[in-house]
Amino acid sequence: MKVNGMNVEGIVRIANAEVYGLKQSIIASAYPMATSYCEDMDQYVVEEKDFKRVRHLGKATPGSGHDCFLKGIQVQFDLQAPEYIWRQLDRYHFIDYISSQSKMHMILKFDIDEMCNKYVTEDAIVNLKKYIDYYNNVDWYSGRFKKDYEEDCVRRRRKIDPNWEFKLKLRNGEEMEFTKENLFKMIIANCPCGFMLTARMTTNYLQLKSIINQRSNHKMQEWHYITDWMKGLPLVDEIVMKNWED
């Protein structure tokens, strides 16, 4: 079933969200104590006794094993979030990437202003765009820097070194050649943590149970918005939360 996403401009966005297997997993939650199985889940009418059972099982202590039916309730959605949220999300084993935007492939073509969240400083954006411009026009800048050097030598009445080449200077004092390879290293290394990337994710209610439990009071506000959205998914408030959240 399709469910609503959410959008907090410049912070986090969820779209194209769907939930699968809700009814089927509710039915299957009875199997451990059943003497038969449901031959046609489409025809089965979920009753109050089924909801009572899953409310009890779903709110079991995390890790007890009694809430395993939650694994059958699948959730897929597009998530746009900054780099620091993605790195924290990666610690969860049962939320996975279907496909995602690639910084390695597209950093030179992204609209950097649009891709950075509102907390990234103007200085950081200007610096990143500078190195991207260098990369995209490396030959022109090599000639420009060479000309500037020669003109400076003439102005200062210094001998021009015919082998002089512009170097990239690192903060540790090291110098690197002004090449596309080295410029790309600088671009990737100086991409801010507030860089927003979108990925299609797949997970399940059991994993969401852990995320909600661990991230609802996180110091990063993005997690508050994400977990609030998770809490609003169908039946999450009835079969995932309550007892263990108190």
Where are the language model's segments positioned?
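Family-specific signature for flavin-dependent thymidylate synthase
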Residues: 1-246
